[in-house]
A protein has these predicted regions:
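RNase H-like two-metal-ion nuclease catalytic core shared by retroviral integrases
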Residues: 106-110, 194-196, 202-205, 216-239, ...
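Helical coiled-coil/dimerization "stalks"
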Residues: 1-29
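C-terminal domain-tail junction helix/linker
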Residues: 210-214, 238-297
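Active-site beta-loop-alpha junctions of metal-dependent nucleic acid enzymes
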Residues: 140, 162-185
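Conserved, non-catalytic sequence blocks in retroelement Pol enzymes and Pol-derived host proteins
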Residues: 45, 65, 78-79, 124-125, ...
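An active-site-proximal beta-strand-loop segment
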Residues: 121, 125-160, 166-168
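Basic, flexible linker segments flanking DNA-binding modules
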Residues: 2-7, 26, 33-127, 223, ...
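Mobile genetic element proteins and their domesticated derivatives, centered on retroelements
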Residues: 25-26, 36, 56, 71, ...
Length: 297
């Protein structure tokens, strides 16, 4: 049985010490008497900490993949602790997230000529639709694998387009790109960055980019950090949704529905992003940007 925390033992002593002396209770439970008296002198702080723990647990339930900073930002101003205290409480109460090492599933075509890396690790953008990232991930479902290709805008980390299919051939990627263009239009010279997977070096994908006036950019082979923000999105998707569902017991149509709903109603509209000013959700930041442009016109 796990040993109780000192504060829990102090609370028991405070409730039950009438039957015997405080010194005897402390000795029996293996805690310091001075610690008990110090604990008694800080009821206001205890109440604040209890309220903070309760609030952090609520944030974790609503946002399973939030890091400590985002959890703190989601709290009301009166409860916000320092990062150090927030981290200690999250660690003590099991609210920290375990990180999984990202791994790519695309394979490079050794005969294809890769595009130049135009981003060189710079995933920031001051305006929408100037830098898009794209990649593929997979989910193992009851009736086989489901593949997702998504397009992320570096401006606000929003998913501007995505496509799902039972295979990871090039049309999966062109479909995701076309869905982004359908939603936000074409911006001449827009950079589309990916890894060196054969889907992205294919004639069909490159022709699609050229027809839209887009520029292609590629990271190094086998280096996930060259497309880190895209990998981060897939990690968030899996922590928030996929790892919390019995995907292996669900058919692809069900999983497809969950991914669509999570992306459109939660990730783009509600989930805070530390990469955005004031940790704004993606489409909230985009809306504010558009309002500022209109006000300045």
């Amino acid at each position: 049985m796990a040993r109780k925390k000192p504060r829990e033992l102090y609370a028991w002593i405070a409730k039950n010490h009438d039957a015997s002396s405080i010194a005897l209770c402390c000795a029996a439970l293996g805690v310091r008497r001075e610690g008990y008296y110090d604990w008694q002198k800080r009821p206001c702080r205890r109440e604040r900490d209890e309220a903070l723990v309760s609030a952090l647990k609520e944030v974790r339930d609503e946002h399973p993949a939030y890091g400590v900073r985002s959890m703190i930002e989601a709290l009301s101003e009166r409860l916000k602790p320092s990062y150090g205290k927030g981290y200690i409480i999250c660690r003590e109460y099991g609210l920290l997230q375990k990180r999984r090492k990202p791994h790519g599933i695309t394979k490079a075509n050794p005969k294809a000529l890769p595009a130049e890396d135009l981003l060189k690790g710079d995933f920031k953008s001051e305006t929408p639709n100037t830098k898009w990232l794209t990649d593929i991930t997979e989910m193992k479902c009851l009736d086989g694998k489901l593949y997702l290709c998504a397009v992320l805008d570096c401006f606000d980390a929003s998913i501007v387009g995505f496509s799902m299919d039972i295979n990871m051939k090039t049309p999966l990627c062109t479909s995701a790109l076309n869905s982004a263009v359908k939603r936000y239009g074409k911006t001449e010279g827009l950079i589309v960055h990916s890894d060196r997977g054969s889907q992205f070096t294919s004639h069909l994908f490159r022709e699609t980019l050229a027809n839209k006036g887009f520029r292609q950019s590629m990271g190094r082979t086998g280096n996930c950090f060259d497309n880190a923000r895209m990998e981060s999105f897939f990690a968030t998707l899996k922590k928030d949704l996929i790892y919390r569902l019995p995907v292996y017991k669900m058919n692809r149509a069900e999983v497809r529905h969950y991914i669509f709903e999570w992306t459109e109603t939660y990730y783009n509209r509600k989930r805070r992003h530390t990469s955005n000013e004031q940790n704004l959700p993606p489409l909230v930041k985009r809306k504010l940007f558009q309002e500022q442009i209109q006000a300045a016109a």
